């Protein structure tokens, strides 16, 4: 028996299914343990199975726990289903019994009509059961009904059904009672005195509600139609209280179901029935009483008491009125108000307003518990934001195991933890948002029509700058490298109608995505230029997406229509596929066919642009008393003038001498110039101006804000610089630690270090964004330094120390830097078109990639005879089936489709001669290196590994 257990085999896939893990994981583990298995269908012995279960013990425990939880859940569900089924059966039986109780008397009477006569049962209510004091209590009790529990359950469960069939059943019973052959003695009811102040009500009274129908019983040949509860309805015993609570509970459960029936039609029906039911009856003498009506009718069940000494209209209450009153009572118990639709609407509106008020209050409370803080804030700053003392913050840090001082910077995780300890939620913002300057609201009298800001977008060489050149009547294209605009330019022009328009010329190629996005943020209208002899390019679609995301209207200009190969209709079709449907085709985008070289359609294009601007009603604040602000469009470093930035004014007037802050730098306006270099005294809204007076180079997209004094501007800039400096320091330290950990874990990653120097800040950002995209898991670009201006000796020394290359974009090194670079044998490259930079860097990174290995099949051989050679081993006599085998080929030995060897050929012979290759159709002899288990019928596959150059 023990031998059979040891010899028992287990399939890997079955073991994986039992452990609820991937069969590939089990197969990989078996291979690591030295098991000789080929696939998940392979078999393993008992020892290997125990090793597998030991390795995947956690998974086994999880599977067992999951199965236990699932079984327990199934048992609970089964128990609940059984209880629900039993409850449902009881309720169904009770409903059937109660339903038969209301229907069976009539059926029974029909069957027994020839034998047992119908008897009308009249019950007299004693005077002591109904008194004036009890009648007063009726007004105070919502539902003073004393019914047996099964009857109340039937009323609660079958309220709707009873309401619909009550009138018909009672009518049938009334007819049957009236047609009785046997005379029944009628006992007059005594008149019940009632107080004069008690009004006549349409709702069913206590006596009416005391009547209940039960299962019919034949007593002495008589059919009992109804019974009257003779117990006092005003009993204050515990049993009465318990029944009252149960009744209210049942009514509450049915309230939601009955609400759907409370509509205006019920109200109209009740009003109509009341109008038709109230009839004038003759007054009766005081000694007489009303004739008793059969049990089961509404009149006998709950007759309203009469007022003495007065003749008054008494409504003849019918079944519809009773049903409506019952529903109204139940509705009142559920606090649903009246049944009118107007009352319901007011009630719902009140509930909605209360919910909205609660939600707004909760939102305000949640906002009060959110602290907006910059990363690396100090305990003192954090304490001011949360309304606590710095001492409390430091003590909390000590309790958390962090020893800090009052001015020490805290990292992001520490700030979140401390805020959570004080009941706040930390929301991190940038240093500019934290120190944002409050802008005064614009006064309506200061708002005037301003010139529109137009951005020209499109693909490379589609004619954007040529269009602007024709409008400005100056040759701007001649100064651009390869006809490609290298950085954003802002220009103000005056068209024929003496109206001013500000143009932003953005680069069209993909590398300047961020610059184009900034152009879309400050622009009012976009002119999308597409060449008629080309097609809609990816950069064109990208420009469309930027404009749509910014909510900027688009005017399409189809350029180069003067060329013979121009096809404007094709461009319109492609634009419609991109979501831009022109007006000619029923869309909302204006379109104009132009020729920027010959000036065809330019005037019409300007008219459409101005018409779009008039529709938008573009206005700006032209007040000279407010502090102006604008957007930094572009910045550059001039050798003689220093930092020069192109600013697009948004509100107010920029004047010479104004102190300002822009991003992390500040300054004082020393000079203002237009795009042609002419000095001006001030600049208003939508006017581009070149500003001199910056202390440092600002970044494109920063907001320039005029401050009240130099001191305020300097303080604000210093606060931003401290936060930015701390952020950069922490980030560089974290990057170094992360890189060390990554290199230890994954091995050394190949990096191409470089230093970038360019003429403008926008060009640097575009280059950095483009270069950082060229990377994968093995190689990447590491920019160790970037700056504006010429290449200096410091840049060369940094490149030599970090083994980096230097890229100069439209800048050159000085004399000393050039000599030092030649001495250090550094690679310094100069470019004027950004495409060339990206292409060269991509090629360099591809060269750093390890080659990709591919297997190339050469041929296959079949072993037809095996020879035993002394001192060599087994040699296979093979027949070349296909392809070709070489002496240095790698081979794979297959037996019955299963690979059992993968290695190198040791010898390749034809007859007794060693050969280098054997073609198909020839016989040869082979021997395998370090392997001689060759059998007849084996297949030998020959292949080789080919290295292929990889691409990013």
From Swiss-Prot:
Sorted alphabetically, the Gene Ontology cellular component annotations on this record are: cytoplasm
Region labeled G5 — which residues? Answer: 595-597
Which parts of the sequence bind GTP?
458-465, 505-509, 559-562
What Pfam families does the record tag this protein with?
A: EF-G_D2 (PF22042), GTP_EFTU (PF00009), IF-2 (PF11987), IF2_N (PF04760)
Q: Which residue stretches belong to region Disordered?
A: 74-95, 153-204, 230-256, 273-319
List the biased-composition ranges (Basic and acidic residues).
232-242
Region of interest called G1, as start-end residue ranges on this chain: 458-465
- Annotated region G4: the residues are 559-562
Q: Name one GO molecular function term.
A: translation initiation factor activity
Task: From the UniProt entry, list the residue stretches annotated as the region G3.
Answer: 505-508
**Principal location:** cytoplasm
Q: Where is the signal peptide?
A: none
Location within or outside the cell: Cytoplasm
Where do Low complexity bias regions lie?
153-168, 286-303
- Annotated region G2: the residues are 483-487
Keywords from the named record: Cytoplasm, GTP-binding, Initiation factor, Nucleotide-binding, Protein biosynthesis
Q: Which domain of life is it from?
A: Bacteria
- Annotated ranges, domain tr-type G: 449-619
State what this protein does.
One of the essential components for the initiation of protein synthesis. Protects formylmethionyl-tRNA from spontaneous hydrolysis and promotes its binding to the 30S ribosomal subunits. Also involved in the hydrolysis of GTP during the formation of the 70S ribosomal complex.
Q: Which family does it belong to?
A: Belongs to the TRAFAC class translation factor GTPase superfamily. Classic translation factor GTPase family. IF-2 subfamily.
Name of this protein: Translation initiation factor IF-2
């Amino acid at each position: 028996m023990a031998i059979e257990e040891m010899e028992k085999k287990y399939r890997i896939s079955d073991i994986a299914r039992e452990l609820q893990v991937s069969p590939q994981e089990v197969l990989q583990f078996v291979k690591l343990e030295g098991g000789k298995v080929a696939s998940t269908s392979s078999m393993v012995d008992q020892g290997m199975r125990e090793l597998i279960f030991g390795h995947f013990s956690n998974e086994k425990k999880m599977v067992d726990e999951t199965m236990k939880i699932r079984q327990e859940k199934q048992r609970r569900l089964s128990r609940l289903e059984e209880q629900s089924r039993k409850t449902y059966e009881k309720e169904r039986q009770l409903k059937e019994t109660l339903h038969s109780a209301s229907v069976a008397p009539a059926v029974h009477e029909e069957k027994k009509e020839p034998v047992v006569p119908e008897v009308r049962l009249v019950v007299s209510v004693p005077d002591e059961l109904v008194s004036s004091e009890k009648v007063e209590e009726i007004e105070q009790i919502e539902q003073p009904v004393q019914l047996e529990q099964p009857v109340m359950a039937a009323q609660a469960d079958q309220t709707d059904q009873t309401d619909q069939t009550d009138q018909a059943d009672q009518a049938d019973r009334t007819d049957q009672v009236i047609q009785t052959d046997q005379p029944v003695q009628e006992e007059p009811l005594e008149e019940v005195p009632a107080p004069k102040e008690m009004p006549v009500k349409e709702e069913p009274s206590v006596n009416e509600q005391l009547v209940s129908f039960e299962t019919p019983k034949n007593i002495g040949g008589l059919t009992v139609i109804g019974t009257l509860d003779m117990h006092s309805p005003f009993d204050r015993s515990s049993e009465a209280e318990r029944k009252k609570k149960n009744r209210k509970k049942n009514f509450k459960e049915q309230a939601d179901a009955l609400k759907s029936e409370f509509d205006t039609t019920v109200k109209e029906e009740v009003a109509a029935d009341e109008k038709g039911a109230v009839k004038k009856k003759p007054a009766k003498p005081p000694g007489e009483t009303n004739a008793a009506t059969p049990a089961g009718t509404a009149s006998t069940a709950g007759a309203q008491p009469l007022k003495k000494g007065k003749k008054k209209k008494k409504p003849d209450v019918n079944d519809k009125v009773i049903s409506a009153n019952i529903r109204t009572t139940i509705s009142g118990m559920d606090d649903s108000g009246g049944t009118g639709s107007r009352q319901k609407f007011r009630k719902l509106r009140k509930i909605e307003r209360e919910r909205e008020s609660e939600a707004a209050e909760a939102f305000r409370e949640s906002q009060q518990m959110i602290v907006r803080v910059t990363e690396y804030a100090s305990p003192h700053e954090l304490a001011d934001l949360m309304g606590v003392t710095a001492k409390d913050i430091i003590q909390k840090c000590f309790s958390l195991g962090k020893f800090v001082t009052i001015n020490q910077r805290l990292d992001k995780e520490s700030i979140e933890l401390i805020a959570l300890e004080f009941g706040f939620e930390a929301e991190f913002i940038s240093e500019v948002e934290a120190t944002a300057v409050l802008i005064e609201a614009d006064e309506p009298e200061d708002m005037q029509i301003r010139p529109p800001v137009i951005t020209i977008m499109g693909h490379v060489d589609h004619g954007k700058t040529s269009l602007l050149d024709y409008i400005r009547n100056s040759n701007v294209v001649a100064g651009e490298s390869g006809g490609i605009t290298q950085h954003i330019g802002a220009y103000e022009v005056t068209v024929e109608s003496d109206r001013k328009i500000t143009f932003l010329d953005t680069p069209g190629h993909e590398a300047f995505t961020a610059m184009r996005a900034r152009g879309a943020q400050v622009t009012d209208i976009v002119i999308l230029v597409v060449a008629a002899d080309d097609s809609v390019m990816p950069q064109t679609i990208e420009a469309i997406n930027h404009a749509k995301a910014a909510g900027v209207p688009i005017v399409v200009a189809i350029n180069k229509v003067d060329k013979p190969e121009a096809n404007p209709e094709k461009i319109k079709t492609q634009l419609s596929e991109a979501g831009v449907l022109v007006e000619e085709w029923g869309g909302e985008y204006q379109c104009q066919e132009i020729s920027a070289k010959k000036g065809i359609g330019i005037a019409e294009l300007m008219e459409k642009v101005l018409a779009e601007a008039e529709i938008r009603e573009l206005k700006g604040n032209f007040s000279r008393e407010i502090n102006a602000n604008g957007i930094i469009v572009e910045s550059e470093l001039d050798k003689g003038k220093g930092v020069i930035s192109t600013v697009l004014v948004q509100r107010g007037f920029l004047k010479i001498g104004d102190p300002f802050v822009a991003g992390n730098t500040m300054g004082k306006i020393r000079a203002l110039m237009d795009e042609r270099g002419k000095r001006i005294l001030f600049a208003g809204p939508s006017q581009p101006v070149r500003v001199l007076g910056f202390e440092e180079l600002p970044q494109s997209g920063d907001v320039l804000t005029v401050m009240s004094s130099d001191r305020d501007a300097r303080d604000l800039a210093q606060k931003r610089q401290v936060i930015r400096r701390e952020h950069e320091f922490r980030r560089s330290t974290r990057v170094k630690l992360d890189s060390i950990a990554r290199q230890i874990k994954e091995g050394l990653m190949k990096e191409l270090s470089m230093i970038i120097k360019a003429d403008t800040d926008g060009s640097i950002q575009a280059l950095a964004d483009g270069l950082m995209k060229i990377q994968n898991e093995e190689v990447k670009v590491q920019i160790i330094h970037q700056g504006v201006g010429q290449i200096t000796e410091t840049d060369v020394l940094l490149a030599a120390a970090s083994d980096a290359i230097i890229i100069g974009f439209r800048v050159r090194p000085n004399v000393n830097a050039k000599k030092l670079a030649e001495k250090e044998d550094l690679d310094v490259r100069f470019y004027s078109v950004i495409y060339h930079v990206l292409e060269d860097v991509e090629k360099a990174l591809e060269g750093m990639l390890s080659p990709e290995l591919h297997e190339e099949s050469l041929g296959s051989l079949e072993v037809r005879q095996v020879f035993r050679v002394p001192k060599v081993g087994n040699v296979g006599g093979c027949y070349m089936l296909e392809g070709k085998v070489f002496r240095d080929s790698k081979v794979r030995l297959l037996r019955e489709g299963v690979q059992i060897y993968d290695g190198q050929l040791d010898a390749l012979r034809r007859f007794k001669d060693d050969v280098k290759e054997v073609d198909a159709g020839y016989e040869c002899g082979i021997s395998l290196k370090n392997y001689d288990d060759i059998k007849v019928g084996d297949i030998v596959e020959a292949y080789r590994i080919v290295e292929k150059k990889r691409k990013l």
